[in-house]
């Protein structure tokens, strides 16, 4: 037993070899499998978090800005992917770049910590710091630091010897080199730049193979390799309360700028800065020079204590690529949409009779100074866009661009003046119709030719275009307006509508001309009264103008609402008291009658002095008797009743110290409301006055019960109803002892069984009672044994017998 030694597991062996080798081999294989799975999972996490984490910054302004812009340098893409940076670096293949990658960062570090650490070093300062995060907000352990110039990045790396110490941890630094951009492909249908691994377009679902065949080789590579230059630069990391004057003061040593050259982006709700602004210069060369100056500043530019990042402003959308490989600016789609509507409306107005012409406001007229600056800015902006569009499109296809200067200039916010011109000849009247008919076949580049049959449009496939506000149809290339249900052709600048019977797209102008010329002259009067069911291009333009006015009014009301309440009330009391005293001295008793006589003279004089009779909305067509146009016409005329230079209300004949007091007077004063009501009624015709009274009657509550009482009188109240009395029915219940107890009861039978006989007493010797015990009623409140506490009353006695016995007992007690 002692010699038998048990073989240990480490010493076992067999014909299959040592178990040690087998266990080691299995362990190595399982360890390699786990390592492969972990590597695959980490790569999947990087690929899945690529889009969400790259935008997850501490600054929401920078997040919105990067989401709305295309970064050509770092390879951001509009479909949700970007050319990822090479995270697994090879030192031998590392190339110098402006972006430096910091690896091995602590999990608790933030972007602000990295930025503070970078600012503490002497030398060039970074332009941007981006910390990579997961969807949960936890840091992924690496970040990107971007410099303005390549020299700054290389000098900073050499000064720190590619190593940093952050929070007691050694951080490795590497140059970040993005993946090659020529691997990405451009969709030929919707012109979207897709990530290289996508086999179908992210937006329209087109195959990658078709786009690679149709697009000429080298087009995307040559386009993407060119840097983006424009006349506008963007300023990032602006403080929430920075104003335009501060930006102008900071940029004044480097460029001469005006207020209209700077656009500070603010939040619509909070009215605070969103963190960036745009500076537009006269040319792209000036913008490039200013950008180089600002990027070369040491220390960098600071406004209100915050370091400002400077770069070229990129477009929010990719440029459109024509089938032959040339590019056209996508901004022209949004810019020509409203211009085409206003241009077609002016063409249709000149083609109908030719007696009305709409020109710009002349110097000296009311409203000229207010709109002169805006008109100049808009004209300059859209002329630059139109010039770029014409040069690109003409070099691309060799055809003339249909965008005219009149259509571009009409985009500016203008007031039009109505003048009379001699009537044109019939040939001139026919020119607009012939031009539209000849332009219809020219819509072939978008795939839509009016008159040919097409499939029924599928609105579920449309994509929303933020720049124009329309929905883009990738199959036909048209832009769809859901409000008016019209399609817009961006090349021919025409509005179309879908005809279900003919299964084709029809021109909106043709439908309007058919309605006007197809009916006999006898029915023209009825046709003017009937409202057209379908909207034409001029009605769409009116809707756009009305919408713009409503937005401006909402902004003004929103600004005026933010005023201290106490100061408003005190100023209102002082002004109202002084105004009432002055009004009582001058007006006396005949104020109302004199005012009614004065208002028509005031309006007549205003019409003679101001040739601007009607606004832009009423000038589009002669049929302006509907309610919306009537309200707009009255509002435009009411604006003339206030003199904003003298701060006086011409209607009430009162002067105020400032603009706020005048605005409060117009909005809150009962006197102004009363005078305005009289003024409006005096300006209305009989038909309009009847329509207004009818609408007021409909808005008021109609007491039909009072009308019935006045007509038929008050009826007499009805007689009160008598309550019905029901007699309680007699209930027959069992009374077994009413006639006495007989010998048939159970107790009697039990006693007889024990030897008892009727008439004898109870007990062994028959010494007990012989009659049954009778029930007696005791008086309430009487104690046991008290005199008169009980009187003889059986349970079978009626109420009458019980009362008689009680009276007899009481009588005997009294004796």
UniProtKB/Swiss-Prot annotation:
Signal sequence segment: none
InterPro entries documented for this protein: G_patch_dom, Nucleotide-bd_a/b_plait_sf, OCRE, RBD_domain_sf, RBM5_RRM1, RBM5_RRM2, RRM_dom, Znf_C2H2_type
GO MF term (any one): RNA binding
SMART domains: G_patch, RRM, ZnF_RBZ
Compositional bias per record (Low complexity), positions renumbered to this chain: 426-446
Keyword annotations from UniProtKB, A to Z: Apoptosis, Metal-binding, mRNA processing, mRNA splicing, Nucleus, Phosphoprotein, Repeat, RNA-binding, Spliceosome, Zinc, Zinc-finger
Domain of life: Eukaryota
Region (Sufficient for interaction with ACIN1, PRPF8, SFRS3, SNRPB, SNRPN, SNRNP70 and SNRNP200): 452-535
Location of the protein in the cell: Nucleus
Gene Ontology CC: one annotated term: spliceosomal complex
Pfam families named among the record's database cross-references: G-patch, OCRE, RRM_1, Zn_ribbon_RanBP
Domain G-patch: residue ranges: 743-789
Zinc finger residue extent: C2H2-type: 647-672
Domain RRM: 98-178, 231-315
BP GO terms, sorted: apoptotic process; mRNA splicing, via spliceosome; positive regulation of apoptotic process; regulation of alternative mRNA splicing, via spliceosome; spliceosomal complex assembly
PROSITE patterns linked to this entry: G_PATCH, RRM, ZF_RANBP2_1, ZF_RANBP2_2, ZINC_FINGER_C2H2_2
ZnF (RanBP2-type) residues: 181-210
Residue numbers bearing the Phosphoserine modification: 18, 59, 69, 72, 78, 444, 621, 624
Residue segments, region Disordered: 1-93, 411-467, 510-539
Function recorded in the entry: Component of the spliceosome A complex. Binds to ssRNA containing the consensus sequence 5'-AGGUAA-3'. Regulates alternative splicing of a number of mRNAs. May modulate splice site pairing after recruitment of the U1 and U2 snRNPs to the 5' and 3' splice sites of the intron. May both positively and negatively regulate apoptosis by regulating the alternative splicing of several genes involved in this process, including FAS and CASP2/caspase-2. In the case of FAS, promotes production of a soluble form of FAS that inhibits apoptosis.
Protein name: RNA-binding protein 5
Organism: Bos taurus
């Amino acid at each position: 037993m002692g010699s038998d030694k048990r073989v240990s597991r480490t010493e076992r062996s067999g014909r299959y070899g040592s178990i040690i080798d087998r266990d080691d081999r299995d362990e190595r294989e399982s360890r390699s499998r786990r390592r492969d799975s972990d590597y695959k999972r980490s790569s999947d996490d990087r690929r899945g978090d690529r889009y969400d984490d790259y935008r997850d910054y501490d600054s929401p302004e920078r997040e919105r800005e990067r989401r709305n812009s295309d970064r050509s340098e770092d390879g951001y893409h509009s479909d949700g992917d970007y050319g990822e940076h090479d995270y697994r670096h090879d030192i031998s293949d590392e190339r110098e770049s402006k972006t430096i990658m910091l690896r091995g960062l602590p999990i608790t570090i933030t972007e602000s910590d990295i930025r503070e650490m970078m600012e503490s070093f002497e030398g060039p300062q970074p332009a941007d710091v981006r910390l990579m995060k997961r969807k949960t907000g936890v840091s992924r352990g690496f970040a990107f630091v971007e410099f303005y110039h390549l020299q700054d990045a290389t000098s900073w790396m050499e000064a720190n010897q590619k190593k940093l110490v952050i929070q007691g941890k050694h951080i490795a630094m590497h140059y970040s080199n993005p993946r090659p951009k020529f691997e990405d492909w451009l969709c030929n249908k919707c012109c979207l730049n897709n990530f290289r691994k996508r086999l179908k377009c992210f937006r329209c679902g087109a195959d990658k193979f078709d786009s690679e065949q149709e697009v000429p080789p080298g087009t995307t590579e040559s386009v993407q390799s060119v840097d983006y230059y424009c006349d506008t630069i963007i300023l990032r990391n602006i403080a929430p309360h920075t104003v335009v004057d501060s930006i102008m003061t900071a940029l004044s040593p480097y460029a001469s700028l005006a207020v209209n050259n700077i656009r500070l982006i603010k939040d619509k709700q909070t009215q605070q800065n969103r963190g960036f602004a745009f500076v537009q210069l006269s040319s792209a060369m000036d913008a490039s020079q200013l950008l180089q100056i600002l990027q070369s500043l040491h220390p960098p530019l600071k406004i209100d204590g915050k370091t400002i990042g400077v770069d070229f402003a990129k477009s929010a959308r990719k440029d459109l690529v024509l089938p032959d490989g040339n590019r056209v600016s996508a901004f022209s789609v949004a810019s020509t949409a409203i211009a085409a509507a206003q241009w077609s409306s002016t063409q249709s107005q000149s083609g109908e009779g030719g007696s009305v012409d709409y020109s710009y406001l002349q110097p000296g007229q009311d409203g000229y100074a207010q709109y002169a600056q805006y008109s100049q800015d808009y004209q300059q902006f859209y002329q630059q866009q139109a010039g770029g569009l014409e040069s690109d499109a003409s070099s691309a296809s060799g055809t003339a661009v249909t965008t005219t200067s009149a259509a571009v200039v009409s985009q500016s916010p203008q007031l039009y003046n109505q003048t009379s011109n001699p009537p044109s000849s019939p040939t001139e009247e026919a020119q607009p119709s012939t031009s539209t008919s000849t332009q219809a076949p020219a819509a072939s580049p978008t795939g839509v030719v009016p008159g040919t049959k097409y499939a029924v449009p599928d609105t579920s496939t449309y994509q929303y275009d933020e720049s124009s506000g329309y929905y883009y149809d990738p199959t036909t290339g048209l832009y769809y307006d859901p409000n008016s249900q019209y399609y817009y052709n961006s090349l021919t600048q025409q509005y179309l509508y879908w005809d279900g019977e003919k299964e084709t797209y029809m021109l909106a102008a043709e439908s309007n001309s058919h309605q006007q010329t197809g009916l006999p002259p006898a029915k023209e009067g009825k046709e003017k009264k009937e409202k057209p069911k379908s909207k034409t291009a001029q009605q769409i333009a009116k809707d756009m103008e009305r919408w713009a006015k409503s937005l401006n009014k909402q902004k003004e009301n929103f600004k005026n609402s933010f005023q201290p309440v106490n100061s408003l009330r005190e100023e209102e009391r002082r002004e109202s008291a002084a105004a009432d005293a002055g009004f009582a001295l001058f007006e006396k008793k005949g104020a109302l009658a004199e005012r009614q006589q004065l208002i028509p003279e005031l309006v007549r004089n205003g019409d003679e002095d101001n040739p601007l009779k009607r606004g832009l909305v009423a000038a589009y067509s002669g049929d302006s008797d509907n309610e919306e146009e009537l309200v707009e016409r009255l509002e435009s005329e009411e604006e003339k009743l206030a003199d904003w230079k003298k701060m006086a209300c011409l209607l009430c004949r009162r002067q105020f110290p400032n603009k706020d007091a005048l605005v409060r007077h117009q909005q809150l004063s009962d006197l102004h409301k009363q005078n305005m009501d009289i003024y409006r009624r005096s300006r209305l015709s009989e038909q309009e006055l009847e329509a207004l009274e009818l609408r007021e009657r409909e808005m008021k509550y109609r007491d039909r019960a009072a009308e019935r009482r006045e007509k038929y009188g008050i009826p007499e109240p009805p007689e009160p109803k008598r309550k019905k009395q029901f007699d309680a029915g007699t209930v027959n219940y069992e009374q077994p002892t009413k006639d006495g107890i007989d010998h048939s009861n159970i107790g009697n039978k039990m006693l007889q069984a024990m030897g008892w006989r009727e008439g004898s007493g109870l007990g062994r010797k028959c010494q007990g009672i012989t009659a049954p015990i009778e029930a007696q009623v005791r008086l309430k409140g009487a104690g046991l044994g008290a005199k008169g506490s009980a009187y003889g009353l059986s349970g079978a006695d009626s109420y009458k017998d019980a009362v008689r016995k009680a009276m007899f007992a009481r009588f005997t007690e009294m004796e």
